[in-house]
Amino acid sequence: MANILKKPIFWLITLPVLAAVIWLFMLPDQANTATVDPVAYRAELQAERDKKDEYMRTNAESPIPDKATFKGLTYFEADPSFRVMAKLEPFPEGKAEKLVIKLTDGTDEIYEKYAHATFTVDNKACRLLVLKFQNSLSVLFQDATSGQQTYGGGRYIDIDLDAVANNQVVIDFNAAYSPYCAYNPSYACPLPPPENKLPVAIKAGEQYVQK
């Protein structure tokens, strides 16, 4: 391979798509997913997915090798119940640990441990390590769908720092996306830390099947 493209995970999607992800965490009344209008939520989410398909199909920075035959990404049906309020257990300020994250090409990148997020899915207690890179937060995770309906190397969720309040934040698994290396091996992408393997099937967000 002549040149391995290495991009931090926060730049694996363009600004318009990132803005859409941020919007999902800024929905009103984050403390209760039942307050989200499911019809409006699904409509807005579908609009953003359509926008991402257009980007993947037409933009020169898209990882899709054969854009002419690309018909769109495949997703689980939008489900507001996978938009969960997580409690954060932050690492002490000024004492945050660094974490070496392996990339798919065998190299490393250094991230900062921001907090552990605890929440429930299907009445099961879950815990994920939230990482910080520059001024953004991200969750890199695997679950029971990894390697089956979703990319085996895991999926990502980006979180805006401003969405954190009182050591709580909404994690919307409907916004989970596959890294670029899922579609193009020229990209080197971070792998989830071993502790971020959820014991449940997260049937939300992007699947690993093209239409």
Task: Enumerate the language-model features and the residues they cover.
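A mature extracytoplasmic/lumenal domain signature
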Residues: L88, K132-Q134, D143-T145, F173-Y177, ...
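Hydrophobic membrane-insertion alpha-helices, especially the h-region
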Residues: F10-M26
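Acidic, glycine-rich flexible loop segments
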Residues: D143-Y177
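Extracytoplasmic/periplasmic/luminal assembly and interaction segments
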Residues: E48, N59-L99
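Short, Lys/Arg-rich N-terminal segment immediately upstream of the first membrane anchor
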Residues: M1-K6
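Mid-length scaffold segments of soluble, non-membrane domains
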Residues: P92-G154
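C-terminal partner/receptor-binding element of secreted or periplasmic proteins
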Residues: N184-K211
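Ser/Thr/Pro/Gly-rich low-complexity linker/stalk segments immediately outside membranes or between
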Residues: P28-A43
